[in-house]
Amino acid sequence: MTDNLVIYHLHSDNSLLDSCTGYKLYIDRAAELGQPAIAFSEHGKPLNWVKKKMYCDEKGIKYIHGVEIYLTESLNEKVRDNYHTVLIARNEQGVKELNLAVSKSCDKDHFYYVNRLSFDEFLKLSNNIITTSACLASPLNKLPVDHPMYESLVKRYDFLEIQSHDCQEQRDFNVHLAELAKKYSKPLIAGTDTHSLDKYKAECRKILLKYKNKSYGDEDTYDLTYKSREELDAAFARQGVLPPELYRQAMDNTLVMADMVEPFELDASIKYPILYGSSEEDSRIETERVDRMFKEKLEAGIIPPEQEKGFRSALTEERRVFEKLGMSGFMLCMSELICWCKENNIPIGPGRGSVGGSRTAFVTDIIECNPEQWHTVFSRFCNEDRKEIGD
């Protein structure tokens, strides 16, 4: 079964406590409907995007990287205008640019209740970012049409987003967007502003909003559940303000937008630091460091003579594993960092987690607990078959 629709304006429980639906439930539903792609537009930040992409890949659905960003007229004035706009990465470079823009929006001079970009910063985004005008909190709805930035904003949007909510403000905005689309030759696109998987999850969200003491005006008249093409078509028909050929073309344009997005591969491999130019050089320096500090601890009696043999055997094996996994630079980095902290009177803890099984970590002052004394196990921290980074 194939459903000719892509849901791209979508909020999971990552969206500032504004949803009770986990991202996997949405992706499962998209796969069930046969929808070819899905995008998440979480409020302000593309949280958990790596996990979302990996799960989309697992389900055979195209992942589209997006966010619903907050815009402000000026960063100089502390005003909670917080206009909404959806950003979608067109390609891998767009993913990096989108993430960088979100990071910038979190800077101290940008943040005011929420992370924000200025209108000027938004307009300077490259064509690697696809933009839609978002919901009723869009600047195209909240600003007067004679605002000096209004026309520039309209021209920057790649798509003007109509939605099917059955309230007068949305009806009026849809008509206005259709007029703007005609005037500026901009395509309409059908957004859903999905916040819940189904009616049950929508009720859960109502309870959550009550708990937060939040109310969003006419939202009781909205249906923010996940839609199939047939369901969204029926919702626009009930709304009754746009001709069918217009809103159906807007639904088709969700597929057009998805086709504009280039798929990209995610390198989820573990990446350890290289401190001195190459893994081989890091390994050589780490070996010298371990040998020197081991000798110092033996001479100081920190490592008792009866433990020397066990330590030597363990250090040799750990060195082999670290070199095979490319971890020498990581261990060297941690040792140098912690020793520097101690030399500069910066408090650190005695160590935690499975690293307590590493004799190398003890010898190089990463931890203070002697693994040989307490018979802790190195393989719990690191072994050739472990896929995750040890803690």
Language-model regions: role of each:
Residues 1-6, 242-354, 362-367:
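Non-catalytic structural connector segments
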Residues 45-111:
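Hydrophobic or amphipathic alpha-helical targeting/insertion segments
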Residues 203-216, 367-368:
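Conserved, well-ordered active-site substructure
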Residues 232, 236, 240, 382-391:
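A structural-propensity feature for long, helix-poor, extended segments
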Residues 361-389:
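Class I SAM-dependent methyltransferase SAM-binding "motif I" and its flanking Rossmann-like core
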